[in-house]
């Protein structure tokens, strides 16, 4: 939704035109669609987004957009609707506490901010997305602060979630542990 806001000129100097974004929400529909590499991904209005969602500009908007009550309500409805069609594995900062509080399996993956920033920075560099490590680290820390202190659906571990510190694990090790 942050990408949509940018593409439709609803963001000016980091400030979102909330009224216009709220008007657009009913037209934003989510579905499952085959992605560029053949995997099934979530699509918005039949478009699958990839690398364009990993930019610093989008990352800086995520927590701001997530704090808008109408956006949270719309996303909640859309995410729950998607799960009715098939079993899903979703990640997100409130998936186990708000979106699917009764999910059969919940994992709360965590790592030190510096480790998460290194991972994000390496991913961005590998994909040619410009950013400095300092910028990425600042974004990780700020998102954690904003998400854990927001009024609506703050970042929190669900009581029944298994917490896993992935600081010393690679993707394959985490996947093997979860399976």
Residue ranges of model-derived segments:
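Glycine/charge-rich, flexible interdomain linkers and switch-proximal surface loops
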Residues: 24, 38-41, 92, 98, ...
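Residue-level signature of catalytic and energy-coupling elements of molecular machines
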Residues: 46, 75, 89, 140, ...
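Conserved, well-folded catalytic cores of nucleic-acid-processing
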Residues: 7-8, 28, 68, 82, ...
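Active-site phosphate-binding and catalytic loops of NTP-dependent enzymes
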Residues: 16, 31-34, 87, 146-153
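Anionic, Ser/Thr-rich low-complexity intrinsically disordered regions
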Residues: 94-95, 101, 108-118, 127-139, ...
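N-terminal phosphate/diphosphate-binding loop that engages ATP/GTP or pyrophosphate donors
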Residues: 1-54
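NTP-dependent small-molecule kinase module
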Residues: 43-53, 59, 121-127, 146, ...
């Amino acid at each position: 939704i942050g990408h949509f806001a940018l593409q439709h000129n609803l963001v000016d100097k980091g400030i979102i035109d909330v009224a216009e974004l709220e008007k657009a929400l009913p037209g934003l529909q989510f579905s499952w669609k085959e992605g560029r590499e053949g995997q099934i991904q979530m699509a918005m209005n039949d478009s699958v987004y990839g690398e364009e969602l990993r930019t610093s500009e989008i990352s800086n908007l995520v927590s701001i957009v997530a704090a808008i009550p109408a956006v949270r309500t719309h996303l909640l409805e859309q995410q729950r609707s998607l799960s009715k069609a098939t079993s899903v594995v979703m990640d997100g900062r409130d998936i186990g506490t708000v979106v699917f509080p009764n999910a059969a399996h919940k994992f709360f993956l965590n790592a030190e901010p510096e480790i998460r920033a290194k991972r994000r920075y390496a991913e961005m560099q590998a994909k040619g997305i410009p950013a400095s490590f300092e910028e990425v680290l600042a974004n990780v820390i700020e998102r954690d602060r904003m998400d854990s202190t927001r009024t609506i659906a703050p970042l929190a571990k669900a009581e029944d979630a298994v917490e896993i510190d992935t600081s010393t694990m690679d993707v394959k090790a985490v996947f093997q542990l979860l399976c």
